[in-house]
């Protein structure tokens, strides 16, 4: 992972496969463990004890930018910006098929799955409100391979697995996602490592 250090924040380009903080079955090799080791006490202590500097999170299987607060003032200001939605969170996802309509807004509730507590699911009435705005950037079609779409997703809320759940619920599962996929979706002659 790459890192940019400033007086009051760190900006980390997190790789896929790394958890933000320790949790069940994964107590080492997390962003928090690395921050504690390399930043020592130069992190904010606002919030939960075992999440120093952590203002927001992204899923373990997601790569992307994480902003980490080095002091309490920056932590509080960043938290307020996330709460007031003045920081844009934009992600790119490669999905199976053509997403219909090509752009739109997904608004519903997301809750823990009753079948598997490690997964989330869409609900019409229960859970936390979740809003994802999306637009198709490009469609990849060929007579000899499946159709894929590159989709830009802009979050208004930040729920666990939000993009994965929303796109999966539309029938456009993220390529390489092992948790929210249909069993018949296989990539022929392509190494799934390319999609991590």
Protein language model annotation of sequence segments:
Residues 1-2, 6-196:
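RNA pseudouridine synthases
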């Amino acid at each position: 992972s790459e890192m940019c250090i400033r007086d009051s924040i760190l900006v980390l380009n997190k790789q896929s496969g790394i958890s933000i903080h320790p949790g069940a079955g994964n107590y080492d090799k997390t962003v928090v463990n690395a921050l504690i080791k390399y930043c020592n006490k130069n992190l904010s202590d606002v919030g939960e004890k075992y999440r120093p500097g952590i203002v927001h999170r992204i899923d373990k299987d997601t790569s992307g930018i994480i902003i980490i607060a080095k002091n309490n003032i920056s932590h509080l200001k960043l938290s307020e910006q996330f709460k007031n939605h003045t920081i844009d969170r934009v992600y790119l996802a490669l999905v199976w098929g053509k997403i219909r309509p090509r752009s739109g807004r997904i608004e519903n509730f997301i809750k823990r799955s009753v079948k598997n507590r490690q997964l989330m699911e869409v609900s019409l009435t229960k859970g936390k409100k979740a809003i994802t705005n999306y637009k198709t950037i490009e469609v990849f079609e060929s007579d000899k391979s499946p159709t894929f779409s590159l989709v830009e997703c802009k979050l208004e809320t930040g729920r666990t697995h939000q993009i994965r759940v929303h796109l999966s619920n539309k029938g456009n599962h993220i390529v390489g996602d092992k948790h929210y996929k249909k069993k018949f979706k296989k990539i022929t002659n392509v190494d799934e490592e390319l999609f991590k």
